[in-house]
């Protein structure tokens, strides 16, 4: 490094220079290490060169390898589309360049003292003796170099190259002009400009006091009022004007950057049109592209007089290109150099050039009628005929003489008025860009990329006019709907498919790996009304036993197999009584339970999507995906007691799920469930409703097999496991009607619009074939979201939304119970108990407060009256009889009649007498448990340990009931619910606690603790889980193989124990964005899921459509990763 170095550099001002061309330099005060100061002058280009040298020499410090390591300051960028040598640009750059200099000299010595920096700031001869500029007056006619500042106008021989002045002609602006492009200048009338270049296109490059740019020649006039250098003309026949003679004594040449005007006569020149032109007035000539025309007269205003097809008239010069065969002749005629400016950067070079010969006189600043003459060699000036009214017509002999090459050519200005030429003063010629266009090859048209559409993931459609497909299949898009559904053709099939499952690629690139990275998280809303007929409700076929595989709502295969309204034949075999007995085992789809698939599924990290997060937060009401352990518990129960309702539902779920069968896991789960139940009972009163909501989600994802059975979507031969099934099968009309309504709701849902199955209507009398179940109707029929997996009877959504069927709903409870045992299964709004179910022992309760029904499925009653509880739902909705009326009522409005034993309470009300004893005991304990749960829920609500979920009235999806907003998840409408603790029935010892459950909270009233499935509500206490375990055993023993036969919960909507199921890569919903979420409630994990406290931040790495997200928990000493229920998360602000 140099000891003598720059200590400081300050840019103080800018200064204009005109040598070699107009530009600005920055005045820099440089202080050196020896305390000496110098003033140097540098133009921007020198700064730019220095910067490039530094970046090349110090790539690391320049940030080329790592931008974060850059220490070399940034230099103001180049001006690409504007003149960088105008004052306003120079002034704007002043401060940034000053900062650049200051920063530069403060860099580490190996940079600030390098040779490049030293040479840049070192004083040069021009810095010591800066050129003196004489700017003259604004009226000057030319700008001289410093050596000729006061040189008078005189004849110059041109012998001395260094002594010759360069003249820039001055013109006066005759009219205001507003620039249209950056390269142009705006003009004010009366302003004087220096003409640097005159282009045949009619656009001249001029310089004002501060800037330079292109302007239309028609707006300029020579200072003496003439149109100088526009045309060649003579004043009289065979006679040269006096002005012309005067100029013969001078150089017949005038400097312009465009070149010199060569006043030679030549034949008419042939030009080829480069683009079509349509005449806009009678004195113009139109032509097509590529035709040859003869140019009779040229001028620098951009309009040439041409002959085409025997007609003569004016045409824009920019549309003409010299014919190739005419170029040689033209070259021979050139007496001087013709300079064509191909680049603005050549201007300075031209200014430095010397005139090679002074054989021609400069164009005369002709009479008022003259027009400027072309800079390039001007062709033979064909004069207008007298017939045209030209005052300056030249007789034929003059024309012939000129044609022979007469040395003296008078200039004639085309009297536009006389020859009816365009009024160029008000009409600028075509843009200069157009005129230059023919000189440059036209950019090629962008290559058209042919694209094709293909599917990016597997999708199973359950709507009549939908289409199922695998990932990677080629699809032809026939119609696109703004709702997010496209009508596509895949192979020989056509139908509606979610646009989020379709991507496009270049046709040639067939090998492109299908990816879901950019695929929207969830299928969009249903297609347009186009498939309306399909919307009329998935019927029969879709709802057939095959339907279980196909959810009514369209879900991607990976989202969780939907067991939609399937009722397992085995389950169907189970008598309604069994179902009533609470043994209602969720029909177990033949398909592996979603839980198992979920467990297998492992979504890719980074598959997060905020939208899904938001939806999922509300979708899963409880920790539903809660502990797989609980699920396992239930699963175990199911595996061990597959016959038992709980076990059957679980077994379905678990059976399909890899771990479901593991007794050990189930027991562990039970214990965990128990433990969690207690903890969460205190903690999350809302869990219940949450569980129900989870249930909904599960249903959407493909409810657990039990739920599917409960939906009894399967063929009618299967006996309804749930009341809904029963109803469908023809169980007591009341119950059947309810189920039918629920099913009808399911059926009615337009197929075109996949949505969460509506809550089953509670109309018991109406039984509807499962085929007619429609998602939308089901959804409408869904009971309060808070219900427990309540017997899985309803699909998740159903469960969550339907009032939980309490013990009274034995049949659906059977499945529900299995679900209760499996707590995982959400309870759908209990369909009205079938008569068999509710004919069982009814418990008398007293109303503690008046209640006004909100939906038709509910019942109103005054305070202090006795009502008979026919069916109980864990969600807190009980089916009661008051006088001749029956309907759903919130359990917290009822208190046990002192004289009444809760024997049949809980599920047992519905249970068959055969199971009555066990059920009775269970119901008794359940009753107590329910009361305890209610109390806990109330406490939790007050504590707001988990976000409370507004309950929904049993009969439908009415807003009044507080049903959570319906959201689309994987093409299925789902009830958005916040996590709420769903309590598994605590051990009987806790029964003394009685508290009204919130409407959407699920009671753990079911017989025993049900194993919690992943989408089921689990806020069940672990103790409850243990109890459930015991109950499962009892149930298994008492019910024996009957439990498997128990139909799924009434009106059950498929509920899937939604554990993250393995998903093909192609099915992953990827999103590269990493989002940070915050937990909104405590969650106690299991061996498969991660537990966390409320308020914990976590980064979403993967999002599984079933509602389980793979996250990295950020809070804590050591971050860890695991699956967490998405409904326990909310976006971090």
UniProtKB/Swiss-Prot annotation:
Residues 4-128 form the PX domain. InterPro entries: NADPH_Oxidase/PX-Domain (IPR051228), PX_dom (IPR001683), PX_dom_sf (IPR036871), SH3-like_dom_sf (IPR036028), SH3_domain (IPR001452), SH3PXD2_PX (IPR037961), SH3PXD2A_SH3_1 (IPR035450), SH3PXD2A_SH3_2 (IPR035452). Residues 546-555, 577-586 have a biased composition (Basic and acidic residues). Residues 567-576, 608-620 have a biased composition (Acidic residues). Residues 415-446, 505-840, 899-924, 941-964, 1029-1059 are annotated as: Disordered. The modification Phosphoserine is found at residues 406, 421, 547, 567, 593, 644, 767, 769, 819, 1002, 1016-1017, 1038. Found in several cancer cell lines, particularly invasive breast carcinomas and melanomas. GO terms for cellular component: anchoring junction; cell projection; cytoplasm; cytosol; podosome. The modification Phosphothreonine is found at residues 256, 731, 829. Tyrosine phosphorylated by SRC. Phosphorylation plays a regulatory role in the protein localization. The intramolecular interaction of the PX domain with the third SH3 domain maintains the protein in the cytoplasm and phosphorylation disrupts this interaction, resulting in the redistribution of the protein from cytoplasm to the perimembrane region. Phosphorylated on serine upon DNA damage, probably by ATM or ATR. Residues 917-946 form a coiled coil. Residues 634-652, 658-670, 686-715 have a biased composition (Low complexity). Its main location: cytoplasm. Keywords: Cell junction, Cell projection, Coiled coil, Cytoplasm, Phosphoprotein, Repeat, SH3 domain. GO terms for biological process: in utero embryonic development; osteoclast fusion; superoxide anion generation; superoxide metabolic process. It is found in: Cytoplasm; Cell projection, Podosome. One of its GO terms (molecular function) is phosphatidylinositol-3,4-bisphosphate binding. PROSITE patterns: PX (PS50195), SH3 (PS50002). It comes from the Eukaryota. The PX domain is required for podosome localization because of its ability to bind phosphatidylinositol 3-phosphate (PtdIns(3)P) and phosphatidylinositol 3,4-bisphosphate (PtdIns(3,4)P2) and, to a lesser extent, phosphatidylinositol 4-phosphate (PtdIns(4)P), phosphatidylinositol 5-phosphate (PtdIns(5)P), and phosphatidylinositol 3,5-bisphosphate (PtdIns(3,5)P2). Binds to the third intramolecular SH3 domain. Required for interaction with RAB40B. Interacts (via N-terminus) with CYBA. Interacts with ADAM12, ADAM15 and ADAM19. Interacts with NOXO1. Interacts (via SH3 domains) with NOXA1. Interacts with FASLG. Interacts (via PX domain) with RAB40B (GTP-bound); interaction promotes invadopodia-mediated extracellular matrix degradation. Adapter protein involved in invadopodia and podosome formation, extracellular matrix degradation and invasiveness of some cancer cells. Binds matrix metalloproteinases (ADAMs), NADPH oxidases (NOXs) and phosphoinositides. Acts as an organizer protein that allows NOX1- or NOX3-dependent reactive oxygen species (ROS) generation and ROS localization. In association with ADAM12, mediates the neurotoxic effect of amyloid-beta peptide. Belongs to the SH3PXD2 family. This is SH3 and PX domain-containing protein 2A. It comes from Homo sapiens (Human). The lineage of its organism: Eukaryota, Metazoa, Chordata, Craniata, Vertebrata. The gene is SH3PXD2A.
């Amino acid at each position: 490094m140099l000891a003598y170095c720059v200590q400081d550099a300050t840019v103080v001002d800018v200064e204009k220079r005109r040598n070699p061309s107009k530009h600005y330099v920055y005045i820099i005060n440089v202080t050196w290490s020896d305390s000496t100061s110098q003033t140097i002058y540098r133009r921007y280009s020198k700064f730019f060169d220095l910067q490039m040298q530094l970046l090349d020499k110090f790539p690391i410090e320049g940030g080329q390898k790592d931008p974060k390591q850059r220490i070399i300051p940034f230099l103001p960028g180049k001006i690409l589309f504007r003149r960088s040598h105008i004052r306003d640009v120079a002034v704007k750059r002043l401060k940034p360049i000053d900062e650049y200099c200051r920063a530069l000299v403060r860099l580490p010595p190996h940079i600030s003292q390098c040779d490049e920096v030293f040479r840049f700031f070192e004083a040069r001869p021009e810095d010591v003796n800066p050129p003196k500029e004489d700017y003259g007056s604004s009226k000057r006619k030319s700008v001289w170099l410093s050596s000729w500042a006061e040189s008078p106008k005189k004849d110059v021989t041109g012998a001395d190259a260094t002594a010759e002045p360069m003249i820039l002609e001055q013109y006066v602006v005759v009219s205001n002009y507003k620039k249209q492009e950056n390269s142009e200048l705006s003009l004010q009338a009366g302003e004087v400009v220096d003409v640097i270049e005159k282009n045949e296109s009619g656009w001249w490059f001029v310089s004002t006091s501060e800037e330079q740019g292109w302007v239309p020649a028609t707006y300029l006039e020579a200072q003496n009022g003439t149109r100088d250098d526009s045309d060649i003309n003579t004043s009289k026949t065979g006679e040269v004007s006096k002005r012309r003679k005067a100029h013969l004594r001078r150089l017949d040449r005038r400097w312009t950057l465009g070149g010199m005007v060569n006043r030679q006569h030549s034949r008419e020149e042939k030009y080829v049109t480069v683009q079509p032109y349509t005449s806009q007035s009678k004195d113009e000539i139109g032509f097509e592209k590529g035709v040859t025309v003869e140019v009779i007269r040229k001028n620098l205003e951009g309009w040439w007089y041409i002959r085409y097809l025997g007609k003569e008239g004016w045409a824009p010069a920019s549309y003409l290109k010299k014919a190739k065969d005419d170029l040689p002749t033209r070259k021979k005629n050139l007496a001087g150099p013709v300079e064509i400016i191909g680049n603005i950067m050549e201007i300075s070079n031209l200014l430095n050039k010397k005139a090679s010969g002074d054989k021609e006189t400069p164009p005369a600043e002709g009479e008022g009628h003259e027009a400027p003459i072309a800079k390039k060699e001007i062709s033979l000036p064909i004069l207008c005929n007298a017939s045209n009214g030209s005052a300056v017509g030249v007789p034929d002999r003059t024309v012939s003489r000129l044609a022979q090459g007469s040395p003296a050519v008078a200039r004639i200005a085309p009297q536009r008025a006389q020859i009816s030429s365009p009024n160029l003063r008000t009409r600028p010629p075509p843009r200069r860009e157009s005129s230059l266009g023919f000189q440059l090859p036209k950019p090629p048209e962008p290559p058209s990329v042919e694209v094709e559409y293909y599917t990016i993931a597997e999708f199973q459609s359950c709507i009549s006019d939908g289409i199922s497909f695998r990932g990677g299949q080629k699809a032809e898009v026939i119609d696109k709907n703004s709702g997010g559904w496209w009508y596509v053709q895949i192979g020989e099939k056509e139908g509606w498919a979610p646009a989020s499952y379709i991507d496009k690629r270049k046709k040639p690139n067939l090998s492109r790996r299908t990816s879901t990275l950019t695929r929207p998280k969830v299928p969009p809303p249903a297609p347009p009304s186009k498939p309306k007929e399909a919307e009329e409700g998935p019927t029969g076929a879709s709802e057939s036993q095959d339907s279980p595989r196909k959810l009514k709502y369209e879900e991607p295969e990976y989202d969780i197999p939907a067991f939609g309204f399937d009722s397992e034949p085995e389950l169907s075999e189970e008598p309604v009584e069994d179902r009533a007995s609470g043994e209602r085992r969720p029909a177990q789809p033949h398909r592996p339970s979603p839980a198992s698939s979920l467990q297998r599924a492992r979504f890719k990290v980074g598959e997060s999507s905020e939208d899904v997060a938001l939806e999922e937060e509300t979708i899963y009401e409880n920790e539903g995906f809660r502990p797989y352990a609980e699920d396992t518990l239930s699963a175990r129960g199911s595996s061990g007691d597959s016959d038992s309702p709980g076990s059957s539902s679980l077994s379905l779920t678990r059976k399909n799920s890899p771990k479901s069968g593991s007794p050990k896991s189930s027991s562990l789960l039970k214990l965990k469930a128990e433990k969690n139940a207690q903890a969460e009972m205190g903690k999350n009163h809302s869990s219940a409703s949450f569980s129900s909501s989870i249930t909904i989600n599960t249903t959407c994802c493909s409810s657990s097999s039990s739920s599917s059975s409960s939906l009894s979507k399967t063929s009618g031969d299967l006996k309804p496991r749930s009341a809904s099934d029963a109803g469908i099968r023809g169980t007591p009309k009341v119950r059947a009607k309810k189920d039918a309504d629920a099913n009808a709701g399911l059926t009615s849902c337009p197929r075109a619009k996949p949505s969460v199955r509506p809550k089953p209507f509670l109309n018991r009398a109406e039984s509807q074939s499962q085929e007619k179940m429609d998602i939308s109707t089901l959804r409408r029929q869904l009971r309060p979201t808070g219900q427990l997996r309540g017997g899985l009877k309803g699909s998740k959504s159903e469960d969550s939304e339907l009032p939980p069927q309490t013990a009274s709903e034995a049949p659906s409870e059977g499945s529900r119970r299995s679900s209760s045992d499996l707590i995982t299964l959400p309870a759908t709004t209990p369909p009205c108990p079938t008569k068999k179910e509710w004919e069982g022992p009814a418990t008398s309760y007293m109303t503690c407060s008046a209640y006004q029904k909100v939906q038709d499925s509910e019942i109103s009653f005054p305070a202090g009256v006795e009502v008979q509880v026919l069916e109980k739902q864990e969600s807190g909705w009980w089916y009661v009889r008051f006088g001749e009326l029956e309907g759903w009522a919130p359990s917290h409005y009822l208190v046990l009649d002192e004289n009444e034993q809760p024997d049949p309470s809980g599920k047992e009300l519905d249970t068959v007498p055969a199971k009555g004893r066990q059920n009775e005991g269970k119901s008794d304990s359940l009753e107590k448990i329910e009361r305890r749960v209610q109390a806990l829920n109330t406490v939790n609500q007050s504590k707001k340990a988990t976000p409370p979920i507004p309950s929904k009235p049993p009969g439908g999806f009415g807003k009044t009931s507080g049903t959570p907003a319906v959201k689309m998840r994987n093409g299925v409408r789902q009830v958005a619910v916040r996590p709420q603790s769903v309590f598994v029935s605590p051990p009987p010892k806790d029964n003394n606690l009685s508290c009204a459950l919130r409407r959407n909270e699920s009671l753990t009233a079911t017989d025993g603790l049900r194993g919690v499935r992943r989408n089921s509500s689990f806020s069940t206490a672990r103790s409850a889980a243990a109890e459930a375990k015991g109950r499962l055993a009892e149930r298994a023993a008492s019910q024996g193989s009957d439990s498997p036969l128990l139909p799924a919960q009434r009106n059950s909507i498929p509920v899937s124990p939604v554990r993250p199921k393995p998903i093909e890569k192609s099915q992953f919903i990827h999103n590269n964005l990493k989002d940070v979420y915050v937990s909104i409630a405590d969650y106690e994990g299991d061996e498969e899921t991660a537990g966390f406290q409320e308020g914990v931040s976590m980064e979403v790495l993967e999002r599984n459509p079933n509602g389980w997200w793979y996250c990295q928990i950020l809070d804590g000493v050591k971050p860890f990763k695991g699956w967490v229920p998405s409904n326990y998360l909310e976006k971090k602000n």
